[in-house]
């Protein structure tokens, strides 16, 4: 019989919880009950109610609806939230309306369902003779809370936290080395079975450092580098770029000198062979033939060996100088047949048949 009743009631309970969650989370409305002392309702952070001037009414139990006692405004000058007192008894009903009176948000449940406890305070850390650490703090004024203690070595990363949890406000963390330094932090978490799924844990306390047997200076031996001391990236990049450019220029000049030293200078053929490219378009055979045709004829070896005779000067006996020039064979006197030869003063004349003398 009990199983049948559970099967019938379970879907209804789940549907009611889903409906309540849907009403509570509808739009951009957030409800938080801070340490069961005040209830904070905020809206307008999203697109549904951004810029809208909304009004809130509330009541506990079946009393009359009351207006919000204290609004806070956004930067645009419109309402964005309300602070109202929390009561541990009775159901809290919230009604949020727009300027025309239309309902935009409504919820009715205990204020503790939106509980967010305050962080633990006056946290004390003590080493035990066994090498463990006892963490203690004052208890909250209400029940239904679990506490979490996280620890890590001082130089570990953010994700290196190890958790120890329990229902009391006095927890012992074991497995530690007294010669090392550790960081601790604590928070309180409402139990879902006691307050519901919309309750949320408190903020973490500030990190407390425990040095143990080590000196306090050893805990801060290797602090994280300050961002202000980091070298500026832009000047460093510009300096590296300038250095790289200068190195490339020097390498190019040195490479050119090495190339000039290793490779001989090749003369320009257009200066040594005029007309080779202008007239013959690089045809060396045609250029040679043209150069031979325009060159003066060279002397043969026979002409170089030929000796030309020179005329001699003949000194006659009477002291007069006579220049004897050889005559060509066509001008040598030939005596015609039948002529008489006459010699006068050493000169010979030939007398022809007509009586004239021929010298």
Curated annotation (Swiss-Prot):
Q: Which residues form the signal peptide?
A: 1-19
Task: Provide the Fibronectin type-III domain boundaries.
Answer: 119-213
Disulphide linkage map? 68-82, 168-169, 181-219
Annotated domain remarks: The WSXWS motif appears to be necessary for proper protein folding and thereby efficient intracellular transport and cell-surface receptor binding. The box 1 motif is required for JAK interaction and/or activation.
Map out region (Disordered) in residue numbers: 312-336
SMART domains (alphabetical): FN3 (SM00060)
**Do you know which CDD domains this protein is assigned to?**
FN3
Protein's UniProt name: Cytokine receptor-like factor 2
**What spans does the record annotate as topological domain Cytoplasmic, numbered to this chain?**
254-359
Which tissues and organs express this gene's product? High level of expression in liver, lung and testis. Also expressed in heart, brain, spleen, thymus and bone marrow. Highly expressed in progenitors and myeloid cells. Isoform 2 is expressed in primary hemotopoietic cells.
Function, please?
Receptor for thymic stromal lymphopoietin (TSLP). Forms a functional complex with TSLP and IL7R which is capable of stimulating cell proliferation through activation of STAT3 and STAT5. Also activates JAK2. Implicated in the development of the hematopoietic system.
């Amino acid at each position: 019989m009990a199983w049948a009743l559970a099967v019938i009631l379970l879907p209804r309970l789940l549907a009611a919880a889903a409906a309540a969650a849907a009403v509570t989370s509808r739009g951009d409305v957030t409800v938080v009950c801070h340490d069961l002392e005040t209830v904070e309702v905020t809206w307008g952070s999203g697109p549904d109610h951004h810029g809208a001037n909304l009004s809130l009414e509330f009541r506990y139990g079946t009393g009359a609806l009351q207006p919000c006692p204290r609004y806070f405004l956004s930067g645009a000058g419109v309402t964005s939230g309300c602070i109202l007192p929390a009561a541990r008894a009775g159901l809290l009903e919230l009604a949020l309306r727009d300027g025309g009176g239309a309902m935009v948000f409504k919820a009715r449940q205990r204020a503790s369902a939106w509980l967010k406890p305050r962080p633990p305070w006056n946290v004390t850390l003590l080493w035990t003779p066994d090498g463990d650490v006892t963490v203690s703090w004052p208890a909250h004024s209400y029940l239904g809370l679990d506490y979490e203690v996280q620890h890590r070595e001082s130089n570990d990363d953010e994700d290196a936290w190890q958790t120890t949890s329990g229902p009391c406000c006095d927890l012992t963390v074991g497995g530690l080395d007294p010669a090392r330094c550790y960081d601790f932090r604590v928070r309180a978490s409402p139990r879902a079975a006691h307050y519901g799924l919309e309750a949320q844990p408190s903020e973490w306390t500030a990190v407390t450092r425990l040095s143990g047997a080590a000196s306090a200076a050893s805990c801060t031996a290797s602090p994280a580098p300050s961002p202000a001391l980091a070298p500026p990236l832009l000047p460093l990049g510009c300096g590296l770029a300038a250095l790289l450019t200068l190195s490339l220029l020097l390498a190019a000049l040195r490479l050119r000198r090495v190339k000039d030293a290793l490779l001989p200078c090749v003369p320009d053929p257009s200066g040594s062979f005029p007309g080779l490219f202008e007239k013959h378009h690089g045809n060396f055979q045609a250029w040679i033939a043209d150069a031979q045709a325009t060159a003066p004829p060279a002397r043969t070896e026979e002409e170089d060996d030929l000796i030309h005779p020179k005329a001699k000067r003949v000194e006659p006996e009477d002291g007069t100088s006579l220049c004897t020039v050889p005559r060509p064979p066509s001008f040598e006197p030939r005596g015609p047949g039948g002529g008489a030869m006459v010699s006068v003063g050493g000169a010979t004349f030939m007398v022809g048949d007509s009586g004239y003398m021929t010298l």
